[in-house]
Amino acid sequence: MEKTFETPGGVRLSVEIHAGLVVVTAGAVDRTVVTLEADNAGAADLVERATVECRPSGSRHVVEVKLPRVYGMRLLRRNAVTVRVEVPERAEIEVATASADLEINGPVGDVDFKTASGNASIDDVAADVTTKTASGSVTIGTVGGDIRASTVSGDLRCSSVAGAAHFSATSGDLELGAAGSRVEVKATSGNVRLGELAAGADVKNVSGNVRVLALGEGQLHVRSVSGDVAVGVVKGVQLHVDVETASGLVHSDIPLRDGPVGGAGRPEARVDLSVRSVSGNVEIGRALEHVA
């Protein structure tokens, strides 16, 4: 099945699918093309009963794709149904699945992805991202706005976010390459790896390790029970340190006293580092020595 809609002025795409694969490609076009593919008889029946509609909403168009739910013995293998959608750049994307995967290529606007066990690979988002998964993993490139992502056991990875970042995970690992605003992380047993932080972070973790590669400005608060904590501080900033661990070890390559970190940098920038741990070790050093 294939349907083409003329959609000048912007698009909001909504896809509901139980199992399968959703591929969204954004480009310099003024139309939206929806293609539904099936590779077996059961999947073909779902495609036949799917609804694909387009309606105007103010100055933009809303394109809705809905496939029937799959129950009991009629569960299909993961990618038996594929939904391919070509949309204009900066289209808003909303996808809800049970186990279907999502792949977004090209620059899009707001993205909202909810799934139980589906995975997501998202390329370039000009606005905000919201993802919620149980066991699915999410990988995101650049985010021009804010990101809010939560998972139970899946991994979360994002290359960079211009705005604020809010992450929540139980046993999945969290990784963020760079953030232009404040970062908030709540984790239980997964590892947390943060790259370049321009405005600090609040990190709470129970047993996973926490690693911050380059803290450049702002306040970093880390609360951990048994996981190790490693922090790299950018040279030249004013550093203020408050570290406590009950039974873990504290090691620092720079003096743990208030004052500038050695080397050229930004003396007007201030970093407040606060770490509390029960049994985890704490390591503090210069940022370049921590970057892998």
Give the positions of each predicted feature.
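Intrinsically disordered, low-complexity terminal regions
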Residues: 1-292
